Swiss-Prot record:
Name of the featured protein: Photosystem II reaction center protein L
Transmembrane segments: 16-37
Species, as recorded: Synechocystis sp. (strain ATCC 27184 / PCC 6803 / Kazusa)
Disruption phenotype annotation: Very poor to no photoautotrophic growth, no O(2) evolution. No assembly of PSII monomers or dimers; the CP43-less monomeric intermediate is assembled.
Role played: One of the components of the core complex of photosystem II (PSII). PSII is a light-driven water:plastoquinone oxidoreductase that uses light energy to abstract electrons from H(2)O, generating O(2) and a proton gradient subsequently used for ATP formation. It consists of a core antenna complex that captures photons, and an electron transfer chain that converts photonic excitation into a charge separation. This subunit is found at the monomer-monomer interface and is required for correct PSII assembly and/or dimerization.
Effect of F37A: Grows slightly slower than wild-type; 85% O(2) evolved, increased sensitivity to high light, 60% dimeric PSII assembled
Compartments, as annotated in UniProt: Cellular thylakoid membrane
Keyword tRNA-binding: no
Outcome following mutation: F38A: Grows slightly slower than wild-type; 73% O(2) evolved, increased sensitivity to high light, 60% dimeric PSII assembled
InterPro entries linked: PSII_PsbL (IPR003372), PSII_PsbL_sf (IPR037266)
UniProt superkingdom: Bacteria
């Protein structure tokens, strides 16, 4: 039971972290592109 609980918990945390990182990356890319377009 402990073995099953651990792998189940890790992917959820990883998915959340990757999701937040992805959003941050998209925001940074958007700002960079917008600055390029404005210039």
């Amino acid at each position: 039971m402990d073995r099953n609980s651990n792998p189940n918990r890790q992917p959820v945390e990883l998915n959340r972290t990757s999701l937040y990182l992805g959003l941050l990356l998209v925001a940074v890319l958007g700002i960079l592109f917008s600055s390029y377009f404005f210039n």
